[in-house]
Every structure is written in C-alpha cells, then in structure tokens.
C-alpha cells in the first residue's frame, strides 16, 4: 500500500518493479497521493516476468488499484528523447500465474505534460472515472511497450487534450487470443478525440469546445486543492460560473 504521500520535483515519483521485469509487483494499492513536477514518470509500474514460486506471493488473479491520486507534469519534466508520460503501466506475466492480473485506475487526476502523453499502458487495464487535462498533447495511449495491450476498458472518463484523447494500438496478438480494447461512455474534448479500439457511447468534441462546457465539481475541487488552474476551460462557460453537480 502506498497512501497519502506528497512527491514534488523528483526524478521519478514512484517506480515499482525492476527494469528487466524480474521484481514482482502484485495486487498493490496506490491511493491519495500527490505526485507533481517530476523529471521523468510520476508513476511507473514495470512489466512482469512470469511470477516466481515464492512463499507468500499471491497466486491466481490479482488486481492492482490506483485511485484518488493527482499526477501532474506541468513543470520540470524532460523533453526530447528523455520525455516520459505521467504514468506508465507495463504488462503482467505473459504465462502462468498472473496472466489474468489487471491494473484498475479510477478517480485520478492526470494533469499536463508538455512533452508526452498523460497515460500510457499495456496488458490488462481498466481506466474509469478519471479526469485528464493536457493543453500540450495526448491524454491516453494504449499501445505496445514491452508486450501488447490485452483486455482494456477505458470507461466514463473526462478527457481534455490538445492532441489525441484516446489512442489504441493493439500490436500483434497471439492467434485466437481474443483481446478486446473498449472505449466506452467517455466525454472527450480533443484535437483527435478517439483513434482505435472498439468505441461506443462516447461524447466527443474539438479541444477548443471544452471552454463552453462545465467541468465536474469534483474535478474543480481536486485541481484547486493542489493549486492547479482550469480557468482556461472555465472562462467561457455559459453557465454562470457553476460546475456540474451544483
């Protein structure tokens, strides 16, 4: 469990696993953290090699939960080849125990990245009820890294991005794998709202249109608590300065 930390200006905020995938990270809980202005990742969970038979290491399907965090790279991040997303999630075990493990992210705020996407992931993922704002580029990239995206659900998120809102690139899945990447019920204001995946019931509009729509109250509260600003998107809202839910 990683809970209630403030990490400001680090090289990498949270790094879980090992660069070669040899350090198991299983069934974690990461919640109520503020991670801002890192040089590299706010959070990186490395890909996993097949799970070793170690006493005490959970077997079967496990879920890692990432919830109620703020991940921001508004300042201080690397550019060029050294640029990194706010959050990168690697794949789980490719065979044996852990192949059905999933990483679930909900209730998080992903805020600004001048040089990269806000989120990148592969493996088994579920992203729901998060808020993404990037004035500079992409929000969500589901794409191969050390393996491929497997079963992925991007559901009910609010996304404002100058670049692509949700990008899905599947890579080459094993024959008969039947992996599915679903993009469902999101509200997306972006230069290119959705590119790839099985898309349904999404509300999409150009990036600039976000200025005319109210944002959720909880998003305003989360951002203002950490002294961020969404006034760019609120300045032209024809709703008397109110937010959704008031």
What is each residue range found by the language model?
Residues 137-141, 162, 166:
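Non-catalytic carbohydrate-binding regions of carbohydrate-active enzymes
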């Amino acid at each position: 469990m990683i809970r209630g930390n403030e990490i400001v200006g680090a090289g990498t905020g949270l790094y879980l696993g090992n660069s070669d995938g040899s350090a198991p990270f299983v069934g974690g809980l990461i919640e109520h953290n503020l991670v801002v202005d890192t040089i590299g990742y706010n959070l990186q969970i490395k890909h996993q090699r097949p799970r070793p038979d170690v006493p005490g290491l959970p077997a079967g399907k496990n879920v890692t939960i990432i919830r109620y965090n703020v991940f921001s790279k508004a300042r201080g991040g690397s550019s060029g080849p050294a640029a990194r997303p706010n959050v990168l999630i690697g794949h789980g075990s490719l065979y044996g125990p852990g192949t059905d493990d999933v990483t679930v992210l909900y209730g998080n705020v992903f805020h600004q990245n001048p040089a990269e996407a806000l989120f990148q992931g592969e493996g088994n993922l579920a992203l729901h009820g998060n808020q993404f704002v990037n004035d500079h580029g992409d929000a969500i990239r589901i794409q191969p890294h050390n393996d491929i995206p497997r079963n992925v659900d991007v559901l009910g998120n609010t996304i404002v991005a100058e670049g692509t809102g949700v990008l899905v690139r599947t890579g080459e899945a094993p024959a008969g794998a039947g992996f599915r990447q679903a993009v469902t019920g999101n509200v997306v204001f972006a230069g290119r709202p959705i590119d790839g995946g099985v898309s349904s019931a999404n509300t999409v509009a150009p990036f600039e249109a976000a200025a005319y729509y109210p944002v959720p109250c909880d998003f305003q509260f989360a951002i203002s608590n950490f002294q961020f600003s969404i006034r760019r998107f609120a300045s032209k809202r024809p709703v008397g300065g109110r937010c959704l839910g008031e």
